[in-house]
Amino acid sequence: MGYLKGFALYISILILIVFIAGCGKSDKTKEDSKEAQIKKSFEKTLDMYPIKNLEDLYDKEGYRDGEFKKGDKGTWTLLTSFAKSNKPGEIDDEGMVLFLNRNIKKATGYYYTSKVHDEFNEKEHQKKYHVELKNNKIVLLDNVEDSKLKNKIENFKFFSQYADFRDFKNYKNGNISSADNVPSFDAEYQISNTDKNVKKLREVYPITTKKSPVLKLHIDGDIKGSSIGYKNIEFNFSKVKDEETAVRDFVNFGPSDGVS
């Protein structure tokens, strides 16, 4: 799907992930174990939600491994995006990426808008608006004449700032899948429209479908932890062609080198 390719580009991860269902009904015990591992991998991150003051991350340590250089305190990368098909063959995608460098206690990033087309020969039309974080507020660095867009950027909130996953341990019997050729894992859960996170997303974004979403937990990399891979969550409200609607959230901790 074109949107997935675009999402990978925005977070500077140039890896094509092929999702292949890896666990059958005849291997129920193994599937249950994999679900427990996926949930355990997400627990430390989701326990941080809601991160009401993003600047608290300057003092928050994350998973460290040999990829970190000596003395590097690491950088937190946040992304929240909303994708929706508003016309046939086209998906409007917008969101914000923020890099919080713990070494210099500075956070910079950008808000982006993009149109992803189905046609093979059409490229994405993307615009970026640079921002920084000061006193837990988004400060727009570029001149934006569109007052509606300007207000949207300056008042942007990451999903991780208002999400609440205190009931996460109660999520059970997910649809588990993994890839055979790369370390890639997914757990999907059908979520009710009465869920507090779903209600909040419907308040924040123009989600027109009344369908209840599927929550997907995705891991790219070692399921036990890795600073090279990443984890993201997705609320998928519709996968129907020309009705695609999804919200993605990404909170990652990694080496500061190469992050900008």
UniProtKB/Swiss-Prot annotation:
UniProt keyword Cell membrane present: yes
Residues bearing a lipid moiety (S-diacylglycerol cysteine): C23
Signal peptide range in chain numbering: 1-22
Gene3D superfamilies hit by this protein: 2.50.20.40
Keyword Membrane in annotation: yes
One GO CC term, this protein: plasma membrane
Lipidation (N-palmitoyl cysteine): C23
Keywords: Cell membrane, Lipoprotein, Membrane, Palmitate, Signal
Main subcellular location: membrane
Entry membrane topology: Lipid-anchor
Compartment(s) where it occurs, according to its Swiss-Prot or TrEMBL record: Cell membrane
InterPro entries (UniProt xref): Csa (IPR007595), Csa_sf (IPR038641)
Pfam families: DUF576
Family as reported in the entry's similarity comment: Belongs to the staphylococcal tandem lipoprotein family.
Protein name per Swiss-Prot or TrEMBL: Uncharacterized lipoprotein SAS0399
